């Protein structure tokens, strides 16, 4: 059972994922679970070409063609804002305000973040979009370059000793950790893993 995990989800977004996968291995020792850390976009691509049996990605509800999606967690979509940003201390940010700003996102594929791309287009906003995959890389780049990064809303988070904070992004559906699998594949082990992750990650 080949599972691709987006680097955007670990270690901060799903901090318990490693422990949960180890529980799965212990509970089902007959299922050989192989995990690979990949970019958000690569997980989708390798599911589509048959390299992976299942994948975990960060998304806003969209799903690439030929894949079936199950949301494991749902949170209010937000932007990670550095202390030097004019958005610091705000309760929300409108998509139109992102015009010309550096915006870090987990991937550039059109489907997973489709609501974001559509909303930016409708608002006439053209941010400088770059891929920011790993959490600590994103933390550094938002502060070093006064950028913003797609995140989930965590009011009580102790992000880097208070140098960044989350501000809600208006007009977005929930940001999710999602389980993906090929649409027409009947793989009982994949269904079992999906159910197991739903059960153990639902309170995150």
Label each region the model flagged.
Residues 1-28, 32-34, 44:
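N-terminal winged-helix
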Residues 13-17, 101-123:
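Secondary-structure junction motif
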Residues 16, 115-116, 185-197:
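Short amphipathic alpha-helical coupling segments at ligand-binding clamshell hinges
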Residues 19-23, 40-77, 81, 164-166:
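Short beta-strand-centered segments that line the small-molecule binding cleft or hinge
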Residues 31-39, 58, 106, 124-136:
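Short beta-strand-to-loop elements that line the ligand-binding cleft
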Residues 36-52, 135-146:
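Short helices/loops that flank or line small-molecule/ion binding pockets
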Residues 64-70, 74-75, 136-188, 192:
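Beta-alpha-beta core module
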Residues 67-77, 81-103, 187-191:
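Flexible hinge/capping segments at coil-to-helix
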């Amino acid at each position: 059972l080949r599972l691709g995990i987006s680097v955007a989800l670990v270690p901060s977004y799903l901090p318990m994922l490693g422990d949960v996968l180890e529980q799965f291995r212990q509970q089902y020792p007959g299922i050989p679970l192989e995990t690979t850390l990949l970019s958000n976009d690569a997980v989708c691509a390798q599911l589509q070409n048959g390299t992976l049996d299942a994948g975990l990605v960060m998304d806003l509800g969209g799903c690439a063609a030929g894949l079936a999606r199950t949301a494991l967690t749902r949170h209010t979509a937000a932007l990670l804002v550095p202390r030097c940003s004019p958005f610091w201390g705000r309760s929300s940010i409108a998509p139109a305000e992102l015009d010309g700003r550096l915006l870090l996102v987990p991937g550039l594929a059109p489907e997973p973040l489709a609501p974001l791309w559509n909303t930016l287009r409708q608002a006439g906003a053209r941010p400088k979009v770059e891929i920011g995959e790993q959490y600590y890389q994103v933390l550094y780049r938002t502060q070093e370059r006064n950028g913003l990064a797609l995140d989930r809303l965590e009011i009580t988070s102790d992000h880097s000793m208070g140098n960044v904070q989350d501000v809600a992004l208006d007009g977005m559906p929930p940001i999710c950790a999602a389980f993906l699998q090929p649409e027409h594949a009947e793989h009982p082990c994949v269904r079992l893993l999906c159910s197991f992750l739903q059960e153990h990650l639902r309170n995150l």
